[in-house]
């Protein structure tokens, strides 16, 4: 069977369900596909089991079980991620395996916010999930409307405590199971939820519209022409003749891109996602190295000290077999290269065990081009032992 062509006419948004175990994340995901399939034959219903038995995938050396579901509303096309286990959520959010433009926090009205609700909201704040919509689930199991109001208030307060606009964001009361069972009054609540997602979560800025950056992978000297750096453009556009900066490791230098080539052909410009070679004016081969970035002037700066939210691989995942302590000195792998750094643990934390997630303060021995939200891996001798996200730049 021929693959269906991806329809680009509708804007595309990435979302996911987060929240405490057994509050109905996967049931809600299945219910959304079922209700939307009734409106539009393009949408395929995905059963609970097909989502729950998510295949494992690798992201930055870490195995994560993630279910990818797609569907469309009248306005948009969505890619939706749902993870079977709590640890999978933590890994997914920290590694950015599936970036989210917004998240649906599922809270059971029967329980209210629970420890994992809190942890997922904190992680969403830390790793930069920008928008949250709340699905208050299992409302068919609560008779007392005052109790529902109380749970809603509690969720809003919790979100406010993590700097989300708790008073303003939508809280939609649903019964995922009722909708999955085809009960019209509950199907309607899923429609309401998707209308809230459509209107509240804005369109993400496309990678192509952001300031240009390309991590350098390789450097070549071309006789009589100068130095070419190659890599995959992370974001933005680079036009021939534009001034750029080389950032990281040493003092930032300015240069002009005098040529862009892809697959041995010359182009006028390179765009986000392209693997290109950039010819740089006035740059000797030994002035640039792998791990630096070529960037739009002023858009990114080099730093040595940052805070990061980190997931430490368990022994079973090929990680460390023993804990680490303050003063831990591994390599931090940013974009295309390893840099040694020293990690300090949060106050009151004696050690970090394999399988934990923790907030670390890191000082690198050489400056790296970074901004908030940048992902990194932690490696020992080329083996990945952790993954993280820069949550704050300190120096």
UniProtKB/Swiss-Prot annotation:
Any one GO cellular component localisation term in the record: cytoplasm
Amino acids binding Mg(2+): 26
G3: annotated span: 82-85
Subcellular locations according to the entry: Cytoplasm
Residue numbers binding GTP: 19-26, 82-86, 137-140
Entries under InterPro entries matching the protein: EF-Tu_GTP-bd, EF-Tu_GTPase, EFTu-like_2, EFTU_2, G_TR_CS, P-loop_NTPase, Small_GTP-bd, T_Tr_GTP-bd_dom
Listed name of the protein: Elongation factor Tu
NCBIfam families (alphabetical): EF-Tu (TIGR00485), PRK00049.1 (NF000766), PRK12735.1 (NF009372), PRK12736.1 (NF009373), small_GTP (TIGR00231)
Top-rank taxon: Bacteria
Ranges for region G5: 175-177
Domain tr-type G: 10-205
Keyword Transmembrane helix: no
Keywords for this protein: Cytoplasm, Elongation factor, GTP-binding, Hydrolase, Magnesium, Metal-binding, Nucleotide-binding, Protein biosynthesis
Its biological purpose: GTP hydrolase that promotes the GTP-dependent binding of aminoacyl-tRNA to the A-site of ribosomes during protein biosynthesis.
Region annotation G1: where it falls in the sequence: 19-26
Transmembrane segments: none
GO molecular function per UniProt: GTP binding; GTPase activity; translation elongation factor activity
Region (G2): 61-65
Reactions catalysed: GTP + H2O = GDP + phosphate + H(+)
Homology family: Belongs to the TRAFAC class translation factor GTPase superfamily. Classic translation factor GTPase family. EF-Tu/EF-1A subfamily.
Pfam family, one: GTP_EFTU
Stretch list, region G4: 137-140
EC number of the protein: 3.6.5.3
Assembly and binders: Monomer.
């Amino acid at each position: 069977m021929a693959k269906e062509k991806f329809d680009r006419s509708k804007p595309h948004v990435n979302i996911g369900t987060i929240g405490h175990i057994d509050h109905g994340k996967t049931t809600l995901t299945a219910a959304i596909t079922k209700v939307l399939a009734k409106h539009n034959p393009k949408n395929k219903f995905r059963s609970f089991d097909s989502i729950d038995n998510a295949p494992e995938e690798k992201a930055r050396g870490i195995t994560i079980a993630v279910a990818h579901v797609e569907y469309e509303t009248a306005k948009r096309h969505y890619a939706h991620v749902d993870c079977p286990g709590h640890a999978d959520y933590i890994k997914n959010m920290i590694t950015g395996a599936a970036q989210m433009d917004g998240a649906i926090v599922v809270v059971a009205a029967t329980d209210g916010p629970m420890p994992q609700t809190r942890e997922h909201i904190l992680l969403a704040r830390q790793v930069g999930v920008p928008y949250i919509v709340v699905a208050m689930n299992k409302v068919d199991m609560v008779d007392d409307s005052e109790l529902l109001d109380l749970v809603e208030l509690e969720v809003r307060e919790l979100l406010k405590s993590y700097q989300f606009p708790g008073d303003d964001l939508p809280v939609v009361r649903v019964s995922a199971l009722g909708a999955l069972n085809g009960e019209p009054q509950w199907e309607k609540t899923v429609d309401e939820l998707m209308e809230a997602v459509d209107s509240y979560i804005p369109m993400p800025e496309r990678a192509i519209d952001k300031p240009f950056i390309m991590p350098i992978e390789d450097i070549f000297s071309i006789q009589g022409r100068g130095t070419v750096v190659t890599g995959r453009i992370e974001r933005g556009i680079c036009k021939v003749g534009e001034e750029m900066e080389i950032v990281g490791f040493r003092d930032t230098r300015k240069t002009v891109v005098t040529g862009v080539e892809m697959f041995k052909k010359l182009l006028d410009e390179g765009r986000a996602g392209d693997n290109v070679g950039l010819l740089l004016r006035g740059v000797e081969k030994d002035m640039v190295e792998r791990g630096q970035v070529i960037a739009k002037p002023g858009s990114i700066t080099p730093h040595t000290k940052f805070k990061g939210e980190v997931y430490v691989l368990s022994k079973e995942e090929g990680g460390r077999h023993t804990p680490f302590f303050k003063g831990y000195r591994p390599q931090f792998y940013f974009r295309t290269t390893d840099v040694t750094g020293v990690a300090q643990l949060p106050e009151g934390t004696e050690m970090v065990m394999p399988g934990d997630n923790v907030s670390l303060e890191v000082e690198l021995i050489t400056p790296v081009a970074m901004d908030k939200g940048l992902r990194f891996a932690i490696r020992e001798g080329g083996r990945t032992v952790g993954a993280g996200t820069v949550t704050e730049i300190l120096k």
